[in-house]
């Protein structure tokens, strides 16, 4: 097993160990044990920077099911390394922050188990080369995030948010599964790199469009893009460390990773370019607009996260235009990939810090309601400093890193509007317009975030707690991120050669050299747009109290949340009514539906698929076989008209004994003996049960012939006969019985073929079947013992009274 595999599996192993440690080390905060895991992974990933800088990649394989093309293949290039550094680096800071945020009285064993499970799943997503393995880790992120969001499960809002995120992201996961299966059909491979190398085969496939749509749905749901963004604001009910981790650097970035990774395959389609770009821009505008009217600090950050993800998504869509050009023209549009990667890093730094500060404010004051907050500037000066740095970076104000990536975003929108491709030159003017409007509202909610908390009147009477500055443990992580915001803003070259260029080269088909970011590069359209954004943003902030009321009056029926909640109520009710229409308490009706569907399916298949019935190799029917069958049918027929339970049991046993005799004639004496034993025991058990039944020796109701029952019974029998004959006459492969005949004696050293098959060749089946019976028996025994114990206790109470 390689170190790369260990890096992915390590969090999953610790996720199993942590609950055990929690039981034995309750005096020490469990976070100190967990902290070592992401730090070790982060240090290991740092050692791989030189590998990706030189243009090399790391490919490691762990055999799993090689015959099916299913191996645990890990592939690390610049893009995978970038995400791995974010997952482990931000993960380390989040764990450190959680030590100060969560008290020892919390269920820390569960929390860190879920967190490490999520961390390992995210590493698996960004490093897997096998799409099936990627999908398994993808769904594991949804499952583990559900556990994290619902951590405070005593809160109804937490349960609602967790269910909502699970439903939407799992829906996207199923779409992703369909998409990757359609990708694997033309290439006959599950390897992502093989698919990229043979992208032309996929593009010529009739499944290309369907695969593209399904994969985009999977990515959009995970990264909370329009209109699937509604799960993210409700997921804010999770503890703040979860929000800082999942919703700034990891889970919501998984969709961006998928789009970036699949761009070499789908960039040839204009549908990919238009859809990814427009969905990103619409998400940017809509979420930034909604962020301004939120009354909860986490609500503001939730919609701001959706907005920033939309910006990155749009840049990935614009960058795909580069696949339709060559040389310098291609590099012009590929600059959008560079901007997307840079902003992805920047967003993780400033948004992670802002989430942590929000948690600090909540921890200090007991509320996140902006109506109750204000005037905390002198009370929480360190938190104020961190907030100003990171919020201004989010607003796109120099000299912070967010300004550089925001400028790059505006440049890409102006560049894309001039592309003579896919009719972009006709409608492309919308790109910079939407980008500028979205950036204006981004500026507004970023500045208002600072003002809501630290400026205005201090209202101690409305705060559940007396406000105070939080501990150093809660300030250290956001302070580190705020420092990175400044460093990456003033010295972006630290990232360009080591991280950004290798990551961009993983997405783009041409090599990007000499990536540079500057605070000022002339009076360009992007710079002038920035000035317009500042001016309009300040005007909107000054008039905030007037126009924000209009947004807050938005009718509920015009929101996606309204329709989600309505569907969540209507669909279960409709499903229940539909199910109750055919599933009843009457077993006979249920069996009619089940067997009727079987008969219908059988005969539809028979009349739609060509087949042959071959009677040449059928053994001749002997007279004693006919006699046994007549006896069997007679016993079964008499059961229908039996008026005594005892007679029904005897006739049912006669059917079983007749089958045993047939086994003898077909040279299977062991099966016959087994059947005899089973029938004898079954008959004895029936008689014992019969003894405890009410004393009714005869049925009072009059039996009448029911045509439906007869047709269903006859249809099932006929279906089984026809299926057996078709299967016997249409064998496309050699019978497996020959294998047993050749190897039953030399491999298993047995003389009875049936016994050897059951005990050796299918020994695991027999073992598990026996285990199931044993467990069922223990369960029945336990219930009987508990019942007797309760009856004894009840009698004792009565005697005492």
UniProtKB/Swiss-Prot annotation:
Residues passing through the membrane, by range: 4-25, 30-49, 79-101, 108-127, 131-153, 166-188, 208-230, 243-265, 270-289, 302-324, 339-361, 373-395, 429-451, 472-494, 526-548, 589-611, 621-641, 646-668, 672-694, 707-729, 767-784
Keyword Transmembrane on entry: yes
Highest rank taxon of the organism: Bacteria
Compartment(s): Cell membrane
Membrane topology per record: Multi-pass membrane protein
Broad class of the protein's primary localization: membrane
One GO MF term attached to the UniProt entry: antiporter activity
GO cellular component: plasma membrane
GO biological process, one term: proton transmembrane transport
Pfam families linked to this entry: MbhD (PF13244), MbhE (PF20501), Proton_antipo_M (PF00361), Proton_antipo_N (PF00662)
Keywords, comma-separated and alphabetical: Antiport, Cell membrane, Hydrogen ion transport, Ion transport, Membrane, Sodium, Sodium transport, Transmembrane, Transmembrane helix, Transport
InterPro entries (alphabetical): CPA3_Na-H_Antiporter_A, MrpA/MnhA1/PhaAB, MrpA_C/MbhD, MrpA_C/MbhE, ND/Mrp_TM, Proton_antipo_N
Activity regulation, per record: Na(+) extrusion is completely inhibited by the H(+) conductor carbonyl cyanide m-chlorophenylhydrazone (CCCP).
Role according to the record: Mnh complex is a Na(+)Li(+)/H(+) antiporter involved in Na(+) and/or Li(+) excretion. Na(+)/H(+) antiport consumes a transmembrane electrical potential, and is thus inferred to be electrogenic. Does not transport K(+), Ca(2+) or Mg(2+).
Family: Belongs to the CPA3 antiporters (TC 2.A.63) subunit A family.
Subunit structure: May form a heterooligomeric complex that consists of seven subunits: mnhA1, mnhB1, mnhC1, mnhD1, mnhE1, mnhF1 and mnhG1.
Record protein name field: Na(+)/H(+) antiporter subunit A1
Organism listed in the record: Staphylococcus aureus
Lineage: Bacteria, Bacillati, Bacillota, Bacilli, Bacillales
């Amino acid at each position: 097993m390689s170190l790369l595999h260990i890096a992915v599996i390590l969090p999953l192993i610790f996720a199993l160990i942590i609950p055990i440690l929690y039981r034995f080390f309750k005096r020490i905060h469990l976070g100190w044990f967990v902290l070592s895991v992401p730090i070790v992974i982060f240090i290991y990933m740092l050692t791989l920077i030189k590998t990706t800088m030189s243009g090399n990649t790391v490919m490691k394989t762990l055999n799993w099911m090689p015959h099916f093309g299913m191996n645990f293949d890990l592939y690390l290039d610049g893009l995978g390394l970038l995400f791995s550094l974010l997952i482990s680096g931000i993960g380390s800071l989040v764990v450190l922050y959680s030590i100060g945020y969560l008290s020892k009285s919390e269920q820390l064993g569960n929390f860190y188990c879920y967190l490490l499970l999520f961390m390992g799943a995210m590493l698996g997503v960004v490093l897997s080369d096998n799409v099936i393995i990627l999908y398994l880790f993808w769904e594991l992120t949804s499952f583990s995030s559900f556990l994290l969001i619902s951590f405070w499960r005593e809160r109804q809002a937490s349960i609602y948010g967790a269910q909502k995120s699970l439903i939407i992201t799992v829906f996207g996961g199923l779409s992703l599964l369909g998409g990757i299966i359609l990708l694997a059909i033309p290439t006959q491979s599950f390897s992502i790199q093989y698919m990229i190398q043979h992208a032309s085969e996929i593009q010529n496939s009739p499944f290309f469009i369907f695969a593209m749509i399904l994969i985009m749905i999977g990515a959009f749901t995970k990264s909370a893009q329009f209109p699937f963004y509604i799960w993210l604001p409700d997921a804010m009910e999770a503890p703040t460390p979860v929000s800082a981790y999942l919703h700034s650097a990891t889970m919501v970035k998984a969709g961006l990773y998928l789009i970036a990774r699949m761009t070499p395959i789908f960039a040839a389609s204009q549908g990919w370019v238009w859809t990814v770009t427009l969905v990103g821009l619409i998400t940017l505008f809509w979420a930034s607009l909604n962020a301004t009217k939120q009354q909860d600090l986490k609500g503001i950050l939730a919609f701001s996260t959706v907005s920033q993800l939309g910006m990155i998504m749009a840049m990935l869509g614009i960058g795909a235009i580069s696949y339709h050009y060559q040389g310098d023209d291609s590099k012009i549009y590929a600059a959008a990939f560079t901007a997307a990667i840079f902003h992805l890093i920047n967003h993780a730094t400033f948004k992670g810090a802002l989430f942590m500060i929000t948690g600090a404010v909540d921890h200090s004051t007991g509320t996140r309601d902006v109506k109750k907050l204000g005037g905390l500037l002198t009370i929480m000066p360190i938190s104020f400093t961190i907030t100003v740095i990171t919020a201004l970076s989010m607003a796109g104000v120099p000299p912070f890193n967010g300004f550089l990536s925001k400028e790059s975003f505006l440049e890409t929108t102006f560049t894309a509007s001039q592309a003579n491709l896919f009719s972009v030159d006709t409608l492309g003017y919308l790109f910079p317009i939407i980008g500028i409007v979205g950036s204006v509202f981004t500026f507004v909610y970023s500045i208002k975030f600072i003002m809501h908390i630290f400026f205005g009147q201090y209202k101690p009477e409305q705060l559940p707690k007396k406000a105070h500055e939080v501990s150093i443990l809660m300030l250290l992580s956001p302070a580190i991120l705020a420092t990175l915001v400044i460093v990456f803003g003033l010295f972006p070259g630290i990232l360009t050669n080591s991280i950004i260029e290798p990551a961009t080269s993983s997405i783009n088909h041409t090599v990007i050299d000499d990536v540079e970011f500057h605070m000022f590069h002339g009076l360009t359209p992007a710079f002038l747009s920035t000035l317009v954004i500042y001016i309009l943003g300040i005007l909107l902030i000054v008039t905030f109290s007037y126009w924000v009321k209009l947004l807050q009056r938005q009718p509920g029926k015009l929101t996606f949340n309204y329709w989600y909640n309505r569907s969540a109520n209507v669909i279960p009710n409709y499903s229940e009514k539909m199910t109750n229409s055919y599933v009843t308490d009457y077993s006979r009706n249920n069996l009619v539906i089940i067997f009727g569907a079987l008969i219908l399916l059988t005969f539809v298949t028979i009349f739609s698929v060509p087949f042959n019935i071959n009677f040449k190799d059928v053994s001749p029917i002997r007279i004693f076989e006919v006699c046994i069958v007549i006896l069997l049918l007679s016993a079964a027929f008499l059961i229908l008209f039996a008026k005594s339970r005892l007679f029904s049991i005897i006739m049912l046993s006669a059917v079983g004994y007749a089958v045993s005799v047939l086994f003898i004639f077909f040279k299977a004496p062991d099966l016959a003996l087994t059947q005899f034993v089973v029938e004898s025991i079954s008959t004895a058990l029936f008689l014992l049960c019969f003894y405890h039944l009410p004393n009714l020796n005869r049925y009072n109701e009059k039996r009448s012939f029911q045509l439906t029952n007869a047709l269903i019974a006859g249809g099932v029998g006929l279906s089984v006969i026809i299926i057996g004959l078709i299967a016997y006459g249409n064998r496309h492969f050699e019978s497996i019985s020959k294998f047993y005949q050749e190897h039953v004696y030399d491999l298993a050293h047995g003389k009875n073929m049936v016994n050897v098959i059951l005990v050796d060749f299918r020994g695991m089946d027999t073992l598990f079947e026996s285990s199931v019976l044993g467990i069922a028996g223990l369960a029945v025994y336990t219930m009987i013992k508990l019942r007797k114990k309760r009856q004894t206790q009840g009698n004792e109470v009565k005697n005492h009274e």
